[in-house]
Amino acid sequence: MLQTKPYTFWFITGSQHLYGEDAIEQVRQHSQTMVEKLNKIGELPYTIELKEVLTTPDAIRKMVIAANSDDDCAGMITWMHTFSPAKMWINGLKQLKKPLLHLHTQFNREIPYDDIDMDFMNLNQSAHGDREYGHIGARLNISRKVIVGHWQNNDVQERLGAWMRTAAAFVDGHHLKVARFGDNMREVAVTEGDKVEAQIQFGWSITAFGIGDLVEKMKAVSEDEVRRLFDEYQELYRLSPSILEQDEVKAAVLEQAKMELALKEFLEEGGYTAFTTNFEDLHGMKQLPGLAVQRLMAEGYGFGGEGDWKTAALLRMMKIIADGKGTSFMEDYTYHLAEGNELVLGSHMLEICPTIAANQPEIQVHPLGIGGKEDPARLVFDGADGPALNASLIDLGHRFRLVVNEVEAIKPERDMPKLPVAKVLWKCKPSLSEATEAWIHAGGAHHTVFSFEVTPEQLYDWATLADIEVVFINDKTDVLQFQQQLQWNEAFRRLFK
């Protein structure tokens, strides 16, 4: 898996000097116990780092400035153990640039009915201390996540971990570099976009290269390197018999191995963690990259076909959120419109990530009726079944919109022996007709990121951090109300953003 930095999250507890040093020391000890136990459970994806209890406006301001300037800090987790007058937090929160989570909890799980006294009440005041803190967050209109519940509850820890992944993806996005080999597919609208605005909004740097730059890298790949990678293919995947029996078919696989090695070296040298290709820009190449792209996606790289840099970058973000699992570049390809059993067949020419596979992928070589090149090698498999979603990031000219549709992936009812590509079938929620009407009204693309792992809540959190519009299509969607929501969002974004 292509790793992110070993980010940390700062745990910051608020209080005030009104209660005396003994009370603040207890707050400090409780905070330390919570952080130690949260880190020890091993369920959180990143380490929580305990910071001092904050009791003055100046200490709060300095802590925020320190968090902003620490490249390893991916966010702040804040909690008011006692009452902490929120005017103290104004100057600090106004300067905060990192993701913020408000953990509304308390150290003790239950009220000690027999022993509770006013000392206990004064110490354990998060029930109203966090409301005071929450008010100033609303007054300042600060983007923040709120999680409520006892800190040892499984659901609280799961939501905390999910948010940490999302925050890390957002922060990592400000260092994301996308390499585009060639340009967009000619005359296609939705894959275009304002790359400067994307860098302003998300931090993404998108750079174009001629395909000749990749071809030169391929020329430098040695036969020994290719042979070793082919051996790895044999260990990980099934190989169609023709690959081992026919030299020209095996040569097609070796060509993809050469592409993979060249692509990876190019990306690593430039610090790129996402990339695009285009079947119309393949001068000097024998095949469209297929197997090579699938393998790199499985390592965590973002990818978009036909120059689609927005989907490539979004895939990289969602790979981080999903910890590299069950997430792929996707395209709505064709429909099964049997009444009462409407389905979408999702696929692409070649480039679907094997992390969504239900079975062991098989390397096969077949003609590709587009691009005008030799028969490319690719991984062939059926997608897994289960709850999933499709997400599409589009550029509306004056802003970005994220469109999300929840789906249910299903096992294919029948084999498709003449379709040798990776593919997945799904049912749209609430139905194919309603979901697709809403999708089209929202301007969602035909390219998406498909994921079994990333949740709608995580995508909402990411969009909120990025300050972009996000709309959801799910079981609760009413198409007429959805159209009104789009109109309200348009008015809000034009007037207030």
UniProtKB/Swiss-Prot annotation:
One annotated GO molecular function: L-arabinose isomerase activity
Keyword vocabulary terms for this entry: Arabinose catabolism, Carbohydrate metabolism, Isomerase, Manganese, Metal-binding
GO biological process: L-arabinose catabolic process to xylulose 5-phosphate
Requisite cofactors: Mn(2+)
Pathways per UniProt: Carbohydrate degradation; L-arabinose degradation via L-ribulose; D-xylulose 5-phosphate from L-arabinose (bacterial route): step 1/3
Its EC number(s): 5.3.1.4
Annotated HAMAP family: Arabinose_Isome
NCBIfam families: PRK02929.1
Known function: Catalyzes the conversion of L-arabinose to L-ribulose.
Name assigned to this protein: L-arabinose isomerase
